[in-house]
Design a protein with these regions (language model features):
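Exposed beta-sheet edge and beta->alpha loop/turn motif
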Residues: 101-157
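Second-shell loop/turn segments in exported
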Residues: 31-34, 62-67, 127-128
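Low-complexity, intrinsically disordered short segments enriched for Gly/Pro and polybasic residues
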Residues: 42, 48, 88, 131-132
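Short solvent-exposed beta->alpha transition segments
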Residues: 57-116
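Short, low-complexity N-terminal intrinsically disordered segments enriched in polar/charged residues
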Residues: 2-53
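Extracytoplasmic/periplasmic, Sec-exported soluble proteins
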Residues: 36-39, 48-55, 68-72, 111-113, ...
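Broad hydrophobic/π-residue packing in well-ordered secondary structure
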Residues: 47, 56, 60, 140, ...
């Protein structure tokens, strides 16, 4: 009888440990992939992947509405293609995203209202073109707009 109780207790403990490990794994997965910082970084990554492919039309769609006021979609597409592809003499670039940090608030321009709950990161684009190899280093911000993370650049003087 004692042996059966011990065996039952060991099995119950094993099941409890197994379920705890599963629950912890699910929580870590959710925290990692559904956290605001991960989602913000994913939006910036998607933007620069589209830019890398020369798909400036779709990358423009990932801008915050305040960025879209700076250029029409057509002007953005033409300007990006002209500067990067023609002037730099490159077909594409590589990039990395570093240092995702949450900021309580941040302003795109000095005379603008601050965005709350912004994520700041550094994007390093590496070009290998007719003028040699060079890096373009830029602070990039992810801002929530209508439930989606959107890309914003810094225009403060």
């Amino acid at each position: 009888m004692y042996r059966k109780k011990t065996l039952l207790l060991k099995r119950s403990l094993g099941v409890a440990v197994f379920l705890s490990v599963i629950a912890l794994g699910v929580w870590m997965f959710q925290f990692t992939f559904f956290s605001p910082s991960h989602q913000a970084k994913s939006a910036v990554k998607e933007f620069y992947t589209l830019e890398q492919e020369g798909n400036f039309s779709e990358s423009w769609d990932l801008f915050h509405s305040s960025m879209k006021k700076k250029w029409t979609k057509g002007a953005y597409i033409q300007d990006r293609a002209h500067v990067f592809l023609n002037h730099f003499g490159v077909d594409t670039f590589t990039y990395s995203i570093e240092g995702v940090e949450k900021r309580k608030s941040w302003k795109m321009e000095n005379d603008r209202k601050a965005f709350p709950g912004v994520y700041e990161m550094t994007v390093i684009q590496t070009y290998k073109g007719k003028y040699g190899n060079f890096d373009l280093v830029q602070k990039v911000y992810a801002v929530r707009e209508k439930g989606e993370w959107k890309v914003v650049w810094d225009y403060k003087q």
